[in-house]
């Protein structure tokens, strides 16, 4: 049973994310509304900006909501954007159930708090896994969804072994050492050269990540089931954005499942690895806008 948040705290700020240009938002008088809900006595923070049809952008592993900064700036004039920090990331606390299903319940509570009937949900990487769990349980609240460098397949045994090694590294060396080592591999060789400063800044922003959260995410990813049935059965539009140089969610895996939905849209970012919102920002923005406008 989902518990509705009993307490909600509101604060208004020009922006609290390092990646945002605060002056830009003040100049445009576009203020981000920060909200904190209590989900089973744990604080969950999310941000609202803009008006229009609601769109939730769900970040992935080793990130927080600020990873969507360029997309927020691009889409905020046309849509009501909802940007959560998932449990354990950013300024949201870990919850008791850190499974994909447990974190999907948090997203549902945010939708409930916003009094939204239906919204579009776009999930990056692990955020896509959470999105699929949300659609599985609350399909009536999601009118379209997108998998941005994400997959409906369960982990292979090989992938599980890689995650287990990652867990051991995190326990021995800490979260930031792990992220400093692993995050550069998410970018294509071209991106590492062309946006090196942005990648360095992004990694620096992860310094305070919780090792317990990262371990919980890896454990949840290893346990998540195959959800290709969601793709097969949905009547709603589904967006796939894949990176040609993505080692985390290989292009071949995406191509094997993008035909499953009745209404499927597939876009390949030719110069991206796993971080297309940063690597090919303009193209990623255009893809999202086209999907949101025409779904």
What name fits each language-model region?
Residues 1-54, 76-79, 112, 116-117, ...:
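Alpha/beta-hydrolase fold catalytic core
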Residues 233-272, 278:
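Conserved loop-alpha-helix segment in the C-terminal half of the alpha/beta-hydrolase fold
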Residues 60-70, 81:
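Serine-hydrolase catalytic-loop signature spanning alpha/beta hydrolases and amidase-signature enzymes
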Residues 265-295:
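Catalytic active-site module of serine/aspartate enzymes centered on a nucleophile-bearing elbow/loop
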Residues 47, 70-73, 82-122, 137, ...:
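Active-site loop/oxyanion-hole signature of alpha/beta-hydrolase fold enzymes
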Residues 58-60, 242:
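The conserved beta1-alpha1 loop
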């Amino acid at each position: 049973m989902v518990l509705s948040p009993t307490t909600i705290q509101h604060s208004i700020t020009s922006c609290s994310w390092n990646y945002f240009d605060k002056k830009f938002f003040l100049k445009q008088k576009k203020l981000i509304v920060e909200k904190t809900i209590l989900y089973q006595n744990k604080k969950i923070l999310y941000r609202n900006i803009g008006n229009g049809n609601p769109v939730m952008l769900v970040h992935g592993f080793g990130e927080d909501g600020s990873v969507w900064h360029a997309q927020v700036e691009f889409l905020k004039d046309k849509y009501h954007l909802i940007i959560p920090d998932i449990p354990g990331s950013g300024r949201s606390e870990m919850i008791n159930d850190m499974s994909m299903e447990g974190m999907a319940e948090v997203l549902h509570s945010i939708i409930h708090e916003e009094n939204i009937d239906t919204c579009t949900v776009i999930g990056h990487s692990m955020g896509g896994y959470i999105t699929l769990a949300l659609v599985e349980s609350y399909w009536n609240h999601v009118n379209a969804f997108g998998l941005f460098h994400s997959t409906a397949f369960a982990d292979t045994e090989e992938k599980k072994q890689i995650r287990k090694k990652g867990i051991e590294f995190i326990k021995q060396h800490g979260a930031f050492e792990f992220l400093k080592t692993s995050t550069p591999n998410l970018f294509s060789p071209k991106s590492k050269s062309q946006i090196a400063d942005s990648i360095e800044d992004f990694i620096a922003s992860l310094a305070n990540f919780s090792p317990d959260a990262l371990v919980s995410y890896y454990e949840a990813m290893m346990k998540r089931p195959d959800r290709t049935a969601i793709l097969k059965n949905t009547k709603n539009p589904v967006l796939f954005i894949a990176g040609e140089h993505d080692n985390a969610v290989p292009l071949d895996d995406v191509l094997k499942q993008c035909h499953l939905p009745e209404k499927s849209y597939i876009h390949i970012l030719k110069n991206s690895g796993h971080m297309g919102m940063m690597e090919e920002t303009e193209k990623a923005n255009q893809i999202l806008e086209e999907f949101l406008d025409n779904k």
